[in-house]
Amino acid sequence: MHSKVTIICIRFLFWFLLLCMLIGKSHTEDDIIIATKNGKVRGMNLTVFGGTVTAFLGIPYAQPPLGRLRFKKPQSLTKWSDIWNATKYANSCCQNIDQSFPGFHGSEMWNPNTDLSEDCLYLNVWIPAPKPKNATVLIWIYGGGFQTGTSSLHVYDGKFLARVERVIVVSMNYRVGALGFLALPGNPEAPGNMGLFDQQLALQWVQKNIAAFGGNPKSVTLFGESAGAASVSLHLLSPGSHSLFTRAILQSGSFNAPWAVTSLYEARNRTLNLAKLTGCSRENETEIIKCLRNKDPQEILLNEAFVVPYGTPLSVNFGPTVDGDFLTDMPDILLELGQFKKTQILVGVNKDEGTAFLVYGAPGFSKDNNSIITRKEFQEGLKIFFPGVSEFGKESILFHYTDWVDDQRPENYREALGDVVGDYNFICPALEFTKKFSEWGNNAFFYYFEHRSSKLPWPEWMGVMHGYEIEFVFGLPLERRDNYTKAEEILSRSIVKRWANFAKYGNPNETQNNSTSWPVFKSTEQKYLTLNTESTRIMTKLRAQQCRFWTSFFPKVLEMTGNIDEAEWEWKAGFHRWNNYMMDWKNQFNDYTSKKESCVGL
């Protein structure tokens, strides 16, 4: 009798446990399938640091911009009836691939890792498990000079952030190059800024859908690096974006950088040049676009590089422009007038922002040696990075950046050219943006990233390079299998915590007493925080001398001596010819009148 009772108990226990497992399994599966406004999506569970993160990869957020939709603003998506399988990254947008250093991880880690296609408007969502209620959302916008980039890179994996800080991470693909930014201003067939409108539509998707994933649409922080940071700053200016996010983080980029925004004249000129190069020159603008729409995307990509009369390693051949829609006026004017979203911002730069670009064409520079250059090579480098600047303008840069204490030491010229490129293109614009923004009473926090990753594949002389804070922001060093040092793990943990705190509360400071308190950046004191593996410090007025040169002195030099951009090249050549004709005519007229006077009285 006793054994029968035991068997019954065991059977009951077996079926009870089986039922619990089935209930648990179906519960997990229910959590993985989420109903969006357009239809259901299926994600997948990932094991991260002994816990779980649910990833939804490759969710469509717009109609594929194919055929007649090429060069147009993105169109809203229609509904689907089946369950969308969001378990792998989608296509990357069409772009040129960096083939400068074949097989070298340092450059190839930034190349797209999924198929290239015009059908590329997809986004990714990482959510902590169990599904949160009202979690803060961080939306990543990748860099790549508006010419390249994709959300599926390993370095942009949102699972660590989601797991460690219980935030929701979102990233989207947006169109780049001519397919994303070609513009005939005023023409609805190619209005320009399509890539920015892609981003904006993804932000709208988050507002409509993130609650279903456990996110809070009223707590959304944008963060991006390089052109991604410039994009974030443009969303601060664009009235159509203001209601779609709460706060902003800008890593190594801002809209006032010299590469970030293209003038209307130049944007139009480049479109016409592309039309010429692809055999699409027509009298009628709409016919030009019609012809370009019928071209293979590869043909457009191949000709993109040749639309400017001169190029630099930082050339943005097709980028944001003032279209009267996304951007209502020149960004500098909008900033000056205070016409931007009033909110908290976190901004920063890396110690050696310029070095990454030197190995892409500056004389004497190579990733395979110490790149010790001469004064002459420094001058040649200035010609490459400042092709439209007068000789006097280049001379003023040379004078300001020469170390006159030891002007014969070759290492000084190598470092000086890196500083020139970094200060002019990244550090000083970011500081100036933060100063202007904070003058309107907004809390701003500024960082200076000083740590060179132990895993950096580029040579030692390149220092703390552009783009190499990203892995610390996304928490990659927390994955011990990746063999970062213990100090790097601690640094990354601190950065992740500060970024998440800023996103949640508008203040990056940690609650623990042992961490350095990050002060608010004000235009007077300009306090900033250094980020490194040794001792975090509070400093003031980063690169004040150099930035005063770029913001105050250099523009005056250009004004007095002429800074010739591509639009002016043609105009000045035409004016020069006209001036010669006029002088010739005047000389002949003077000659005629003098002869006439000498004839009087004969």
Swiss-Prot record:
Homotetramer; disulfide-linked. Dimer of dimers. It is an enzyme of class 3 (hydrolase). It comes from the Eukaryota. Its EC number is 3.1.1.8. Detected in blood plasma (at protein level). Present in most cells except erythrocytes. Substrate binds at G144, G145. It catalyses: an acylcholine + H2O = a carboxylate + choline + H(+). Changing L153F: In BCHED; seems to cause reduced expression of the protein. The active site is at S226 (acyl-ester intermediate), E353 (charge relay system), H466 (charge relay system). Inhibited by mercury. Inhibited by Tabun. Tabun forms a covalent adduct with Ser-226 that becomes irreversible upon aging. Changing E525V: In BCHED; allele J variant. Changing P65S: In BCHED; seems to cause reduced expression of the protein. Changing G361C: In BCHED; results in 20% of activity compared to wild-type. Belongs to the type-B carboxylesterase/lipase family. GO terms for cellular component: blood microparticle; endoplasmic reticulum lumen; extracellular region; extracellular space; nuclear envelope lumen; plasma membrane. This is Cholinesterase. Changing Y61C: In BCHED; enzymatically inactive in the plasma. Glycans are attached at N45, N85, N134, N269, N284, N369, N483, N509, N513, N514. It is found in: Secreted. It comes from Homo sapiens (Human). InterPro entries: AB_hydrolase_fold, AChE-related_enzymes, AChE_tetra, CarbesteraseB, Carboxylesterase_B_AS, Carboxylesterase_B_CS, Cholinesterase. Changing K40R: Does not affect enzymatic activity. The modification Phosphoserine is found at S226.
